[in-house]
Every structure is written in structure tokens, then in C-alpha cells.
């Protein structure tokens, strides 16, 4: 049976899983977080969208999960020579893509989703990729040092400031791209990938139309936690800041606050955290160290999806 899968993704954990789905030629689309989008030296930067695009094009830097593999940094280095403090280290090919997207949006009048689709086609990607919204929604980390854009908090401050809370500015007025809505409505299953719940998936669910559709769909969820620690990134600190334990139990409780309940929860086989009752749980090795691991986990996800609705 040819089942349609829509994946909710941020920029690190879930792209590793997308790599496996890509290798298996699965039928899926992706809705991507844009809460970290920013403008840097005149460029429109959409880090999570770009990582997903690079992953599906087979050119992602899979050591950092940001940017393009084997990219150079002569542009960044020359900016340093000019005395320009570029807050994000952008590679040369990566910069070219960002420049092209900025041109499409500013000069050609394309919406973000239209620009992303144009780039997707030019990169030869057959899977549809949608930003969660064409409107500006910004993830703000509320800290003891003031309100910080997520880039400021994580890249510039190293995630060190004590966190009081997280909010998604502009989410109440934002709407998803119509094509993303259509894709989500056609999906047989929604897969919530192992991205940071608070700053990757939370912004997507903060868009009310997306949230309401996801609530009505079968949901498979992959935990980004092993024990009480995330596999990578600041998810633990941010989960605690918004009132949840950084564990698979806290993950379920966090998504329940959004009204989203997993039909199947995939968690790591080494994880012994006690879970809420009534959950259908599959335990497997969720750690994706390389492409082989990504394919293995993706194959398991597809098996679960087929059992759920096939």
C-alpha cells in the first residue's frame, strides 16, 4: 500500500531520519519550522528549511547538520577581513542559495513557500517541502539577559543564559501555505520527528490550522530523548524552562498541551523512563550515527506506519 506521510521537522534530529526515508524512496512531504528564520547582512536565512533541502538533495554537511558538505568559507573569511562580524558562519555555496532565495522574495515578489518550491525543483528534489508559514513567526527565548532570538541564544551565547520561557511571536496571526494545508489533509499519517520539541516542533504546532489538522490525524512520534537527555542541542534546558521534564514522558506531556496525542510512540530501547499509561510504544535503537542507522530507523518507522493505517 502506498501511504502518504507528512513529516514535521526542525533542522537536526529529523533530517537524519529524512535521510533514511529518502534512501528508501518513501512517499512523504515535509513541513518545516521557520521560527528561527532571520535576516543576516541582507540575506533571508531559513536554517531548518535549508537543512531539509540539503538533506533531500543529498548534499548536506552531515557532520554539523548545517550547510553544504565540502563547502568553502572564503566569503565569510573575507567579511572578517573587512571587519564585518557575521553572526553565523555561512559557506559559499550555502550563501549563494540564500542569496537566490532573497532575490526571489524581494525582487520577484515570491512568498517564502514559493521560493522554497522553486529551489526544491532546481535542486532536483522530488519530495515536497513546505515552510510552516509564509508569515513571520519568531521563536523568542526569554532569558535572564532579556529576550533573545533563538540564534542569539544558541549560536552567539552558546545556550548559556538561564531560560525563563519560550514564545512564538506572530504565531496567532500566522497561517500555513495553502499547499501545505492540502498536503497535510491528504496525509495518511503525520510523523513528528525527533527534533527539539520546544524550538522546532512547537513553532509548527503554534500555527492553529496546522495544529487542528494534526489533532485529527494518526500520529507517529519519534522521541529525541534517551533517558533524561536529548541526543543533541538545548532541548533539555528548554523543556525544563517551559515546565516539562526533558524525557520521553515530558515529551508526551508537552505535545498533549498542544492537544496532540501519539498513536504510536517510538522511543529508544535503552530508555527506562516511566511512561504515562495507555500509550502504544515501540522500543528500538533511535540513535542515528550514520546513514545506515538512518535507513534502519526509517524502515522501522515505515513498518509502524503501515501497521497503523495499512
From Swiss-Prot:
Pathway the protein acts in: Cofactor biosynthesis; coenzyme F420 biosynthesis
Residues engaged in binding 7,8-didemethyl-8-hydroxy-5-deazariboflavin: 50, 89
GO biological process terms held by the UniProt record: F420-0 metabolic process
Gene3D superfamilies associated with the record: CofD-like domain (1.10.8.240), CofD-like domains (3.40.50.10680)
Necessary cofactors: Mg(2+)
EC number: 2.7.8.28
Pfam families xref list: CofD
Functional note: Catalyzes the transfer of the 2-phospholactate moiety from (2S)-lactyl-2-diphospho-5'-guanosine to 7,8-didemethyl-8-hydroxy-5-deazariboflavin (FO) with the formation of oxidized coenzyme F420-0 and GMP.
Assembly and binders: Homodimer.
Annotated PANTHER family: 2-PHOSPHO-L-LACTATE TRANSFERASE (PTHR43007:SF1)
Similarity annotation: Belongs to the CofD family.
Protein name stated in the entry: 2-phospho-L-lactate transferase
Organism (species): Methanopyrus kandleri (strain AV19 / DSM 6324 / JCM 9639 / NBRC 100938)
Underlying gene: cofD
Amino acid at each position: 500500500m502506498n501511504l502518504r506521510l507528512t513529516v514535521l521537522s526542525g533542522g537536526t534530529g529529523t533530517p537524519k531520519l529524512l535521510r533514511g526515508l529518502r534512501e528508501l524512496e518513501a512517499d512523504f512531504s515535509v513541513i518545516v519550522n521557520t521560527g528561527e528564520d532571520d535576516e543576516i547582512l541582507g540575506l533571508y536565512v531559513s536554517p531548518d528549511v535549508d537543512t531539509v533541502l540539503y538533506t533531500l538533495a543529498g548534499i548536506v554537511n552531515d557532520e554539523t547538520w548545517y550547510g553544504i558538505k565540502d563547502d568553502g568559507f572564503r566569503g565569510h573569511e573575507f567579511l572578517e577581513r573587512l571587519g564585518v562580524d557575521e553572526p553565523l558562519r555561512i559557506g559559499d555555496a550555502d550563501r549563494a542559495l540564500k542569496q537566490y532565495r532573497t532575490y526571489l522574495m524581494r525582487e520577484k515578489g515570491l512568498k517564502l513557500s514559493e521560493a522554497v518550491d522553486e529551489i526544491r525543483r532546481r535542486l532536483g528534489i522530488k519530495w515536497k517541502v513546505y515552510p510552516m508559514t509564509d508569515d513571520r513567526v519568531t521563536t523568542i527565548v526569554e532569558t535572564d539577559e532579556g529576550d533573545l532570538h533563538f540564534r542569539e541564544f544558541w549560536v552567539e551565547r552558546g545556550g548559556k543564559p538561564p531560560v525563563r520561557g519560550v514564545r512564538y511571536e506572530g504565531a496567532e496571526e500566522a497561517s500555513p501555505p495553502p499547499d501545505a494545508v492540502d498536503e497535510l489533509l491528504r496525509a495518511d499519517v503525520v510523523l513528528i520527528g525527533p527534533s527539539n520539541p520546544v524550538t522546532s516542533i512547537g513553532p509548527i504546532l503554534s500555527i492553529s490550522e496546522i495544529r487542528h489538522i494534526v489533532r485529527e490525524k494518526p500520529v507517529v512520534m519519534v522521541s529525541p530523548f534517551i533517558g533524561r537527555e536529548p541526543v543533541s542541542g538545548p532541548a533539555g534546558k528548554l523543556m525544563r524552562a517551559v515546565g516539562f521534564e526533558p524525557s520521553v514522558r515530558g515529551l508526551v506531556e508537552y505535545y498533549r498541551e498542544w492537544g496532540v496525542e501519539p498513536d504510536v510512540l517510538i522511543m529508544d530501547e535503552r530508555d527506562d523512563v516511566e511512561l504515562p499509561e495507555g500509550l502504544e510504544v515501540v522500543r528500538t535503537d533511535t540513535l542515528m550515527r550514520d546513514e545506515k542507522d538512518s535507513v534502519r530507523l526509517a524502515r522501522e518507522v515505515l513498518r509502524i506506519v503501515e501497521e497503523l493505517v495499512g
